[in-house]
């Protein structure tokens, strides 16, 4: 109450910020008459002047009014577009490292030019991030005219570009590209063997378009570079026979033993999208696997030798019970292709990990491709947090403002529209069954069609879009379908969706980034006329004018009919996705309307709000075909969406906490790699490693502080001779000396090792040997890091079991991941020292040959797969709820400087005790007493 009262007096934080930026807008507008007087050359020269001032120490913030005024004037001259005042505010929001929410059609692409121009003046590079190659290329080509006019260079970073082209793109002042490609380039740069093979510069400033899609929807799963691992094809085929033999249990057993309606072998958690084997399910699976000869008679699935089988059992179960054809994937040309659950697009070339994709291939009886081993991985959360300054823009960010602030430290500012919006959002209509809902949708579409009003219908899956298409065909209503299967025609369909009588069915919001203009997209058709070389200039102008006149008539006709009408056939889990669909109507002050048609059979209503709404319908005695249209029901649905959003936020936050473990480790490894690549001589590093390894070996047989009788000298001599090529008569030294200490023996062995090393260096030369050492070091570090990623993956898959022992799984994961990391670094030291001490080389030529062979073994970028797994993978990658919270993630240990402290703080004594009514540590969301507390 007090907050509301204070807001009335002082305004909200958003209003205060906009008011503050309005003062700067006034200053920019005051400069306009003066800037307009400049010639093109004088305007272009301003860029050089600004760069000089930045180099002299002037801040970009101080330069902002002048730079924005220059950019606006250049845009007027080159693009024939003048930035509105609200667009200047948007530019400031982005420059100050915030997220700007701008309505559809408000010109986000043009807004970005202001902060991009200003920040490019520093010479440190600006990245403009889009969701696909088409938008990156379109925006770069469109805006390059403006930037080139102002003397700035523009690069486009696309997939499949060669190495030289990528280096050129990153060297430009401004680089356009996709989120995936920027992330993969970062990973690839940290897998190279030469400094000049890297493409990226330091990460300075990024403007992320459709920031909600990239930083939230896609943040739950990592970018992965992987190579082929061991082949288990036959096992997937055999495991595919298991799920049909198991029965689903209906109901969940309560503490008093009740709650199970029908006993079975596994349970499904639809909210968490997880599958669990029951006690009887474990027994049945073990019996069947024993019959098939996959495990020994009477053996448990949890026996150490059967752990990999457990992984295959759950992969097969998830494939059969949680993933369905034409909803989560399609089968095309004998391959299983993932469908993006957010956009409905086909994700060709991407594969689910953890064996899930192979299990789905076995289920669909298509060729099973080999499993992959992770070579490098990073999440968008951790990649984008590395930029010195990050900003973003979208049409729908306000509902996720808390998450942007919590995870990325980014404030969201809602930017006012240039013209007041005229879209009418009608009340939801809820029907008892899906059939009644679709009947109502067809009636609404027919009404719009007869009045000449264009309609965009949003569906949540390919299956639903094709069902609706079938119903429209039966009703005799012409329409276009825009889903993953029609990907190639996407831009064409979206561009024409605003024509009179046009009915377009779209899966989720495929086609984001392309405006739906009322009356159709005349500019697109005009561009075809412009490119037609058979026409004269006069004929081109005549045809374009005629086209514009026709478009204007259609535009007025559609406006008179009410503008674009949006129909939602289902509510999405997130209010933001619903708002994106609504936002396609009413652009730039045009009229428009939207309405959602729902049924009690929709997953969201069935799982979260169905009982409450059904009770209201029963109480009102609603006849068949009648809809309920009430604010209380819509609020109930919004409440359900908020619950799902909160749950998804918790999942993402928990994933980030796990990923923060491997992120710090990744930084340490990549920093060491970069130091190795940039160092002229690594003799000191190799020497320190040799000293450490030799010390450990000697102390193993001659412990510090021990007496001579406790020493195992013959064994030490044998190990040094056989494993380290050091032939030392240590026993003779002891016999000849009256008294000799363990430290003196260590010094003697170190001296012999140094002498053997120097002899090798002298033989082939310091420079050649140093290059060889660098190759060994990089190759060993990369191989050990890959194995470490796999070890972390296995660790997180079983870490939820620590909850049974009343230990905090997250803390246990951090502690053990740190121990694994320390062990990995020790293994690297040992392996590198072993190779250097054992290598037998007679000439520099032999040394070069050995280095080349090592680099060939490490040249894993030639036969690898680059993919960004979708959320379906993250949700499915773990057989239990806690695993869902860490799925498709590789964790993150302690920061380099404080690892000892962190490890000390992670002892089991510091793990909080779980109370009976506390949430279960496994992450299921249930109370401990109703989850793992029952078992304990």
From Swiss-Prot:
Subcellular location: Cell inner membrane; Cytoplasm
Primary localisation category: membrane
SUPFAM superfamilies according to UniProt: Helical scaffold and wing domains of SecA, P-loop containing nucleoside triphosphate hydrolases, Pre-protein crosslinking domain of SecA
One cellular-component annotation, GO: plasma membrane
InterPro entries given in the database record: Helicase_ATP-bd, Helicase_C-like, P-loop_NTPase, SEC_C_motif, SecA, SecA_CS, SecA_DEAD, SecA_motor_DEAD
Gene Ontology BP term (one): intracellular protein transmembrane transport
Gene Ontology molecular-function annotations: ATP binding; metal ion binding; protein-exporting ATPase activity
Co-factor note (free text): May bind 1 zinc ion per subunit.
Signal peptide as annotated in the record: none
Keywords: ATP-binding, Cell inner membrane, Cell membrane, Cytoplasm, Membrane, Metal-binding, Nucleotide-binding, Protein transport, Translocase, Translocation, Transport, Zinc
Binding site for Zn(2+): 920, 922, 931-932
Catalytic activity: ATP + H2O + cellular proteinSide 1 = ADP + phosphate + cellular proteinSide 2
CDD domains linked: DEXDc_SecA (cd17928), SF2_C_secA (cd18803)
Coiled-coil ranges (or none): none
Cofactors named for this entry: Zn(2+)
Protein residues bound to ATP: 87, 105-109, 515
EC number, as in UniProt: 7.4.2.8
Enzyme's top EC category: translocase
Membrane-topology annotation of the record: Peripheral membrane protein
Main function: Part of the Sec protein translocase complex. Interacts with the SecYEG preprotein conducting channel. Has a central role in coupling the hydrolysis of ATP to the transfer of proteins into and across the cell membrane, serving both as a receptor for the preprotein-SecB complex and as an ATP-driven molecular motor driving the stepwise translocation of polypeptide chains across the membrane.
Subunit structure: Monomer and homodimer. Part of the essential Sec protein translocation apparatus which comprises SecA, SecYEG and auxiliary proteins SecDF-YajC and YidC.
Family label: Belongs to the SecA family.
Name of this protein: Protein translocase subunit SecA
Gene source species: Paraburkholderia phytofirmans (strain DSM 17436 / LMG 22146 / PsJN)
């Amino acid at each position: 109450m007090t907050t509301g009262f204070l807001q009335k007096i002082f305004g909200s934080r958003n209003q205060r910020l906009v008011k503050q930026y309005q003062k700067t807008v006034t200053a920019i507008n005051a400069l306009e008459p003066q800037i307009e007087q400049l010639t093109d050359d004088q305007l272009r020269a301003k860029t050089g002047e600004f760069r000089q001032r930045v180099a002299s120490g002037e801040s970009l913030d101080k330069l902002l009014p002048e730079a924005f005024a220059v950019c606006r004037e250049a845009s007027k001259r080159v693009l024939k577009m003048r930035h509105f005042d609200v667009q200047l505010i948007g530019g400031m929001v982005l420059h100050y490292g915030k997220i700007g929410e701008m309505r559809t059609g408000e010109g986000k692409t043009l807004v970005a030019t202001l902060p991009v121009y200003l920040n490019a003046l520093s010479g440190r590079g600006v990245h403009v991030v889009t969701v696909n190659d088409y938008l990156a290329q379109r925006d770069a080509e469109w805006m390059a005219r403006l930037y080139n006019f102002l003397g700035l260079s523009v690069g486009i970073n696309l997939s499949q570009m060669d190495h030289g082209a990528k280096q050129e793109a990153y060297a430009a002042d401004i680089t356009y590209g996709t989120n995936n490609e920027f992330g993969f380039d970062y990973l690839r740069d940290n897998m190279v063997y030469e400094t000049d093979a890297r493409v990226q510069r330091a990460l300075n400033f990024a403007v992320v378009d459709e920031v909600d899609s990239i930083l939230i929807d896609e943040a739950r799963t990592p970018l992965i570079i992987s190579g082929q691992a061991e082949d288990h094809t036959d096992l997937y085929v055999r495991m595919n026979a298991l799920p049909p033999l198991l029965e689903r249990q209906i109901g969940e057993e309560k503490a008093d033993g009740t709650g199970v309606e029908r006993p079975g072998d596994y349970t499904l958690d639809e909210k968490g999208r997880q599958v669990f084997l029951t006690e009887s399910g474990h027994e049945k699976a073990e019996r069947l696997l024993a019959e098939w000869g996959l495990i020994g008679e009477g053996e448990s699935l949890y026996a150490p030798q059967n752990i990999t089988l457990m992984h295959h059992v759950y992969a097969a179960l998830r494939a059969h019970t949680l993933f369905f054809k034409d909803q989560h994937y399609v089968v095309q040309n004998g391959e299983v292709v993932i469908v993006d659950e957010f956009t409905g697009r086909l994700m060709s070339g991407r594969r689910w990990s953890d064996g899930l994709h192979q299990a789905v291939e076995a289920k669909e009886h298509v060729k099973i491709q080999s499993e992959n081993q992770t070579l490098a991985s990073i999440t968008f959360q951790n990649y984008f947090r590395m930029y010195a300054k990050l900003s973003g823009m979208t049409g729908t960010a306000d509902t996720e403002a808390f998450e942007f602030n919590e995870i990325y430290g980014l404030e969201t500012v809602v930017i006012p529209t240039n013209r007041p919006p005229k879209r009418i959002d009608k009340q939801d209509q809820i029907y008892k069954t899906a059939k009644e809902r679709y009947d109502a949708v067809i009636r609404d579409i027919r009404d719009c069609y007869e009045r000449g009003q264009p309609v965009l219908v949003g569906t949540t899956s390919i299956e639903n879009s094709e069902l609706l298409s079938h119903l429209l065909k039966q009703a005799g209503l012409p329409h276009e379908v825009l889903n993953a299967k029609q990907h190639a025609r996407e831009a064409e369909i979206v561009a024409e969706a605003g024509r009179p009588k046009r009915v377009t069915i779209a899966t989720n919001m495929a086609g984001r980034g392309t405006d739906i203009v009322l009356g159709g997209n005349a500019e697109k058709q005009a561009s075809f006329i412009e490119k037609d070389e058979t026409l004269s200039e006069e004929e081109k102008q005549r045809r374009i004018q005629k086209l514009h006149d026709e478009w204007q008539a259609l535009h007025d006709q559609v406006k008179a009919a009410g503008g674009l009408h949006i129909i939602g056939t289902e509510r999405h889990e997130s209010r933001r996705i619903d708002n994106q669909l609504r936002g396609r109507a009413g652009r730039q002050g045009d009229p428009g309307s939207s309405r959602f048609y729902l049924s009690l059979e929709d997953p969201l209503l069935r799982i979260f709000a169905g009982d409450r709404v059904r009770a209201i319908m029963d109480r009102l005695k609603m006849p068949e075909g009648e809809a309920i249209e009430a604010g209380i029901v819509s609020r109930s649905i919004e409440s359900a969406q908020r619950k799902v959003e909160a749950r998804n936020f918790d999942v993402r936050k928990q994933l980030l906490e796990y990923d923060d473990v491997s992120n710090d480790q990744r930084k340490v490894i990549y920093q060491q790699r970069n130091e190795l690549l940039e160092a002229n001589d690594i003799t000191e590093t190799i020497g320190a490693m040799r000293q450490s390894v030799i010390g450990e070996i000697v102390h193993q047989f001659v412990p510090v502080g021990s007496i001579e009788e406790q020493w195992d000298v013959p064994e030490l001599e044998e190990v040094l001779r056989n494993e380290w090529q050091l032939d030392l008569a240590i026993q003779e030294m002891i016999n000849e000396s009256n008294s000799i200490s363990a430290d003196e023996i260590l010094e003697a062995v170190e001296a012999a090792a140094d002498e053997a090393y120097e002899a090798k260096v002298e033989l082939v030369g310091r420079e050649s040997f140093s290059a060889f050492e660098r190759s060994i070091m990089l190759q060993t570090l990369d191989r050990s890091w890959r194995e470490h990623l796999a070890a972390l993956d296995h660790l997180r898959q079983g870490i939820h079991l620590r909850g049974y022992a009343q230990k905090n799984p997250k803390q246990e994961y951090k502690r053990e991941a740190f121990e694994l990391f320390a062990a990995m670094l020790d293994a690297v030291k040992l392996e590198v020292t072993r190779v250097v001490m054992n290598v037998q080389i007679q000439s520099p030529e032999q040394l070069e040959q050995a280095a080349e062979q090592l680099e060939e073994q490490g040249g894993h970028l030639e036969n690898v797969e680059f993919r960004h797994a979708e959320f379906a993978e993250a949700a499915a990658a773990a057989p239990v709820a806690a695993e869902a919270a860490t799925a498709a993630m590789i964790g993150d240990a302690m920061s380099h400087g404080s690892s000892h402290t962190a490890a000390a703080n992670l002892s089991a004594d510091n793990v909080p005790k779980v109370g009976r009514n506390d949430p279960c540590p496994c992450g299921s969301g249930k109370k401990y007493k109703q989850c793992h507390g029952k078992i304990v």
